[in-house]
C-alpha cells in the first residue's frame, strides 16, 4: 500500500503530523511543498497539507487538489483548499494559538467517532469566512464559524485546528479516519 504524504508548509507542527501518523502505524512521508504533482499522483494514496505561516509560502500545494487523491488540510492547508475552490480567507479576530471548544455539526467520515463538543488547539491568525460551493460546514466554535469543512465527493477535508498537538483531545482519531478514507 502506498504511503500518505505530509506536505511541509513550514509550520511548526508539520513534523508532529508525520510523527502522529507513524505512532498509529500509518506509513507516511514528510515532503516539501514544491514536490511535483506527478510525483504525488504516482507515489501517495493521500495528502495532508500541513500548516504554515503564510499562503505565499505554500509552494504548489493548490495543484495537488486536482489529483483525485484524498486531501486533509490543516490550518493553512484548509485555507489553501478554501481559496482553490472559491472560498474566502481573511485575518482572524482572535489571532494566535490557544485552546478552543469546537462544536461538531456533522459527524461525517473525517469526524466520525467524535463527541459533539471537543477541546482543540487552534490558530486563528487567518480563517475561512466563506466556504466554497459544494463544501459542507462540519464544525464551528465561538470564535470561528468555520472550524472544519468537507467535500466528500472529492474526498477533500479541512480543519482549522491542529489534531497533531497533545492539547487537542482525541486528535489522532482524525488521522485514523483519514487513513480509512485513503484506503477505500
Swiss-Prot record:
GO molecular function terms listed in the Swiss-Prot or TrEMBL record: ATP binding; GMP synthase activity
Residue ranges constituting the Glutamine amidotransferase type-1 domain according to the UniProt record: 3-184
CDD domains on file: GATase1_GMP_Synthase (cd01742)
Top-level EC class: ligase
HAMAP family in alphabetical order: GMP_synthase_A
Functional note: Catalyzes the synthesis of GMP from XMP.
Protein name: GMP synthase [glutamine-hydrolyzing] subunit A
Source organism (scientific name): Methanoregula boonei (strain DSM 21154 / JCM 14090 / 6A8)
The organism's taxonomic lineage, starting at the top: Archaea, Methanobacteriati, Methanobacteriota, Stenosarchaea group, Methanomicrobia
